[in-house]
Amino acid sequence: LCDRRQRQMCIRDSFLTIREHFGSLKNIHLVYMGDARFNMGNSLMVGCAKMGMHFTACAPEGYFPDAQLVAACQAIAAQTGATLDFLSDPAAAVQGANVIYTDIWVSMGEPESVWAERIAALAPYQVNAALMAKADPNAIFMHCLPAYHDKKTAIGNEMCTRFGREAMEVTDDVFESAQSVVFQEAENRMHTIKAVMAATLAEIEL
């Protein structure tokens, strides 16, 4: 884990869960909604490019992945058949999407001085029921956790109250809905971490 990459999270919380749910990664369209400059947006883009999936980063201008990384992923996509799109219109981005993925808007010890500007910029990219309704009817919601979906935690309450919101990056009704696979996603961390440990620490041919 670092600011720019979250490789293990992509292995465990994302692609394994998607494959379990849909049976395959083929033809899956994943939309990353929010700040796509950092570890989850970057790593999901790399993973989707390698897996031949359809990836869309939906973000405000200035919140997209680094151009050099995008170019590297486009080169990979040319070999795997993946597609990469970068849109600023949430409604257009999620049309027919199979997976809607988001992450918290401020993290990794970022100073409070960035909160107001960041939240104002990303507020239109909140994942809510209206947005999910524009995706494929069988779409799933994913989040690497923790999520600020209500005011029941100290930090969630602080941020929502401070900025006059009931939820931040995802609403509680979506987080708790049948479309949400966030806890299945979290469970899969254990299994893929064990696989990585077996591959790197044990004398086992996988």
Model regions: which residues?
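Glycine-rich phosphate/diphosphate-binding loop of Rossmann-like nucleotide-binding domains
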Residues: 20-102, 108-110
